[in-house]
Amino acid sequence: MKIEPENEYRDRRSLTNILGMAKRLLGVSIKENGVYADFTMGNGNDTLYIKKMCPSGTIYAFDIQPAALEATKKLLESEGCMDENVHLICDSHANFQKHIPENETLDGAIFNLGYLPGGDKSTTTKTSSTLTCLSGALDMLGPGGVAVVCVYPGHEEGAREGAAILELAEGFDRVGFDCLYHRLVNIPEAPFIVAFQKKIGKTPKFRKIGKISL
């Protein structure tokens, strides 16, 4: 599910283009025959981006709302990008391990938190399920794999998600992961990005901080 950002956050020429930055960061992980997850399918824009960047890749996309699957399928079909390697799944991203094979390794993952653009704003991503999914996805990342999370702290649940995700990122030892925090420092309520890249040839370690641990 995706929150509808203000127009300023869509301007490709602007530092506020959070979605464009997220795609550029995810692009680091793109490779032939890669395996990717869009954990907040929404209207399918991130799924489409991944498929266009990696036509030979496998994509698992998740959303709890049937309308999101319908919109995404329609978008991909209109672009000639819907094939047997694109899996649109109507389920919580917290349950992703039921749908992605246990022996699969993710090359990249993206989260665009919040609610479905044009949809019911009371149906939004939740901190508990987001952390469950993100923790599992990070564990499933292969060496060099990237997970990118767009956070929208302008609403109550988004602020909780953001605080929890930052706490998670700050808890990783530098040996196993590089963790990036990207935001506008003079707009407290502006969307921001937390990105994770699993280091090649390293074993991730985690320092417990507060109530969060892996």
Region locations from a protein language model:
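Mobile active-site "lid"/loop adjacent to the S-adenosyl-L-methionine
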Residues: 110-133
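Class I S-adenosyl-L-methionine
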Residues: 155-214
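S-adenosyl-L-methionine
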Residues: 1-37, 45-52, 70-104
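Conserved beta-strand signature within the Rossmann-like core of class I S-adenosyl-L-methionine
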Residues: 140, 144-151
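Conserved S-adenosyl-L-methionine
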Residues: 52-58
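Conserved SAM/SAH-binding beta-strand->alpha-helix loop
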Residues: 65
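Conserved beta-strand/loop positions that form the S-adenosyl-L-methionine
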Residues: 39, 62
